[in-house]
A protein has these predicted regions:
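N-terminal pre-domain/capping segments
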Residues: 1-121
Length: 122
């Protein structure tokens, strides 16, 4: 069955600040840097808006997720459920599992696993 989905990347100037992951070499860890963007609506409002426009699914970029707490993810899951919309993809647009720097490669792998754990309840 075919259906129409929209990616949050297509709306990246509407969802508020982008939460970019960067590598801090001296600390040997990831950090989040905010890039200001206008917020016309938030991620919790997106499922209902997308459904009203005829979409059946949303694909979310990790840098649009303002929070990975259990309560926020439960709210996000509820927003998708209430709208009757599918959360199809979580794009983790960061990490290099082929890095020659073992510390960085392990940190990137760990970050990916954290995102998989965060996406599971959503």
């Amino acid at each position: 069955m075919s259906y129409l989905s929209v990616s949050t990347w297509s709306l990246h100037r509407c969802l508020g600040p982008l939460h970019w992951t960067v590598w801090n070499e001296s600390a040997g860890s990831h950090e989040t840097v905010l890039q200001p963007e206008p917020q016309l609506f938030n991620l919790l409002e997106l499922p209902a808006l997308a459904k009203a426009k005829g979409y059946s699914a949303v694909e979310v970029c990790h840098f649009h997720m303002p929070d990975r707490s259990e309560s926020y993810l439960a709210d996000l899951r509820g927003a998708f459920h209430d709208a009757g919309l599918s959360f199809d993809t979580l794009l983790l647009d960061y990490g290099d599992l082929s890095s020659g720097d073992e510390r960085r490669r392990q940190a990137d792998f760990g970050l990916m696993m954290e995102w998989i754990d965060a996406a599971s309840p959503a």
